[in-house]
Amino acid sequence: SGKSMLAKRIPSILPDMSFDEMIETTKIHSIAGTLKHDGLITTRPFRSPHHTVTPVGLGGGGTGTIRPGEVSLANNGVLFLDELPEFSRTALEVLRQPIEDGSITISRSGQKCTYPCSIMVVAAMNPCPCGYYGDPTRKCTCSEQKIKRYLNRISGPLLDRFDIHVEVPAVKFEELRDT
């Protein structure tokens, strides 16, 4: 239905980064070792971790130097969580406080580090495990209990932090072509 394609386009419609945002974003990526060049990062980050990401991968941590996780690598940009219910509940719960505070504090082995994470979180999911609940052309094969279990993978407090919920129905190719 184009949910992922839509999410990938969001950074292109956001305002240009300020110089301070460029510096801050570049610093985070430098610490993480993810800079692809020597100059400033001038475009808003778009991070899309796989649903198997660990809580440490999402929030940050590690041994030795406390490294930023995906929430901080997306700072001043977009963190896209595709197939939201497929992420572990433990990993998703890491997001609650950073979304609220705009920063994340990581404590590991007596060390404490705070990274900024002013992020737009965008998530996509199907209405049920098979993906066809409510589809006018295909029959959903999920039981009511299976759908409920699927939707309950996401906690209410996390859902409360999403300001906008949009249903994106499948559109036939012919309808797109004719518009």
PLM feature spans:
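Conserved D-loop-proximal element of ABC-family nucleotide-binding domains
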Residues: 88-90
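Short gly/ser/thr-rich secondary-structure transition/capping motifs
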Residues: 59-65, 102-107, 145-149
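Walker B catalytic acidic pair
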Residues: 76, 82-84, 94
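AAA+/SF3 P-loop NTPase mechanochemical coupling elements
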Residues: 46-47, 67-76, 106-126, 137-138, ...
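Inter-Walker segment of RecA-like/P-loop motor cores
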Residues: 39-61
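Conserved catalytic/switch belt of AAA+ P-loop NTPases
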Residues: 92-113
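Walker A/P-loop
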Residues: 1-38, 101
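Phosphate-sensing "switch" segment of ASCE/P-loop ATPases
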Residues: 114-118, 128-179
